[in-house]
A protein has these predicted regions:
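Short, well-ordered strand-loop elements centered on a beta-strand within folded domains, enriched
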Residues: 25-29, 54-60, 132-136
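Acidic, metal-coordinating catalytic segment for phosphate/diphosphate chemistry
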Residues: 2-46, 52
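A short, polar/proline- and glycine-enriched secondary-structure boundary/capping micro-motif
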Residues: 38-40, 67-71, 147
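The catalytic Nudix box helix
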Residues: 57-58, 75-107, 125
Length: 174
């Protein structure tokens, strides 16, 4: 599955984001630019998409992404908007990134992640669907169904987002 890349308006550097503490308490509103530049903690959602036979949808991010451009990811997702619930953010990200609406989401849990690039508290969801997918927002350049047995091979051969690997893969059902 290949796509064309277009700029996504909601990823503007001037978009407002909630800076939070690790308990999830909102500290202040900051621009996305400031959040990225200073590595401020924020809320995110990850949605793993699995086929009925258990394959995982793995995708490559656009070169225009503000962090980890062109890297591969095991989940779609993004930053939670100010005042937005986890579930609403997850449904929005599925719609924006894959063109999926109305599919049930299974909540898999929350967790914190921190490295030298990013600091976040995220909710992880699972969506079981075969598609069809549309990549209209340009955040995804290609996508592949990957079996559970093939995931370790993919992880070793390509650059993957470390936050979703850490917070999503351990929560996936067997």
């Amino acid at each position: 599955m290949k796509t064309s890349a277009a700029a996504h308006p909601d990823n503007s550097p001037d978009e407002m984001v909630e800076e939070i503490d690790l308990a999830g308490n909102v500290l202040q509103l900051v621009t996305r630019r400031k959040m990225r530049a200073e590595g401020l903690c924020h809320r995110s959602v990850f949605i793993a998409v699995m086929s009925e036979k258990g394959d995982l949808l793995v995708h490559q991010r656009a070169a225009t992404k503000d962090i980890w451009p062109s890297w591969f990811d095991v989940a779609v997702g993004g930053v939670v908007a100010p005042g937005e619930s986890w579930a609403v953010a997850a449904a929005r990200e599925l719609r924006e990134e894959l063109g999926i609406e109305g599919e049930p989401l299974e909540f898999l849990g929350t967790g914190a992640y921190r490295d030298g690039d990013v600091q976040l508290v995220a909710a992880t969801f699972l969506c079981r669907t075969e598609g069809p997918f549309t990549f209209a927002d340009g955040e995804i350049t290609q996508a592949h169904w990957v079996s559970r047995a093939e995931i370790p091979v993919w992880l070793q051969g390509k650059q993957f987002l470390p936050d979703s690997v850490a917070l999503v893969l351990p929560r996936l059902p067997e």
